[in-house]
Amino acid sequence: VFVNHPERVSFEVATEMVTKVEFSVPGENLDYFLINGPTMKEVLMRYTDITGKPSLPAPWTFGLWLSTSFTTNYDEKTVNSFVDGMFDRKIPLSVFHFDCFWMKDFNWCDFTWDSRVFPDPEGMLKRLKAKGLKICVWINSYVGQESSMFKEGVEGGYFLKRPNGDVWQWDMWQPGLAIVDFTNPAACEWYSKKLEALLDMGVDCFKTDFGERIPTDAVYYDGSDPVKMHNYYTYLYNKVVFNVLKKKKGEKEAVLFARSATAGGQKFPVHWGGD
């Protein structure tokens, strides 16, 4: 069953009755598809006929990815100890991923390496890539008030707004964070250029974190219904990032490492099932 509904959907899976799956939405209309296979492979083929086909990720993406994850205090020496430790143990490594602390804390996101621990990011990336590694860095679509990008975003009108015209902000992840409005073409271009600079530096792909905690009372540049945009936002977010990667790396090399998704999100591979 493909529930083609961008708003909140309630699924009851064998709860009210163990032999049934129920789904419902507020209101009077619901669009859904019953997709026959009969095999699951055929179901997926037909589902992607409706919602879009993913491209085949590059061969290197099928190798082992090593992440700093929630390592909160690390520098190039620490990174090399992780990488060399894998090589010393004869464990092949394809990608090294820098999670959130490649940027200075409380500046997420500003897309700027924390110079306190990474004074020579371009040199570091070259040294890591000389070991045969691809490089991934963590990003999201939130901009904290301490970020150097916050003022740019406010002045350019690149963030979601409140009904009174103020920037929509909250403190859930970073103090006073704002959310990039991907219905605004100028905001998409601004965000894309920040990512292009990282790719020019030697980054190969991005972990597109978050994208699911999107308010339903915000005002969008194009007037979109914020309730319907709650799920669709992540599609636009990952589309923008994937298009940057296609532009700079080519379609056969473009890959991201996405957390949130909605119907059609598979067109921007890949997603992980962790969070």
Q: Model features per residue range: what roles?
A:
Residues 1-275:
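Catalytic-domain carbohydrate-binding cleft regions of carbohydrate-active enzymes
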